[in-house]
UniProtKB/Swiss-Prot annotation:
UniProt keyword Electron transport present: no
Family annotation (PANTHER family): 50S RIBOSOMAL PROTEIN L21 (PTHR21349), LARGE RIBOSOMAL SUBUNIT PROTEIN BL21M (PTHR21349:SF0)
Stated name of the protein: Large ribosomal subunit protein bL21
Name of the gene encoding the protein in the UniProt record: rplU
Source organism superkingdom: Bacteria
Keywords: Ribonucleoprotein, Ribosomal protein, RNA-binding, rRNA-binding
Any one GO molecular function term: structural constituent of ribosome
GO biological process, one term: translation
Amino acid sequence: MYAIFVDGGRQYRVEPGMELDVDYRDIAAGENLKFETVLAVGAEDGLKLGAPTLDGVSVSASVLGMSQDKKIYIQKFRRRKHSKKRTGHRQKNTRIRIEEIAGV
């Protein structure tokens, strides 16, 4: 069984027991999250599609911890001015494990 849900403007295809990174949330490790905007659920008996979401279906997950993406560098260069600037950014993520797909 799998589900497709929306979080932070991105769609994730998940199955129970799967681990993935979602946008950062200020939640301690060990706490639970619930995603209610489920677009589709697939099982042995077929695919259920929402219009646009499925009512009563949710994906529950537990928080494993925090992580960060690789560092990206941004460079600004002004021609003929002997001026340049280089900065970096690391995006924070929350690592979760999918526990169950409820309401199917």
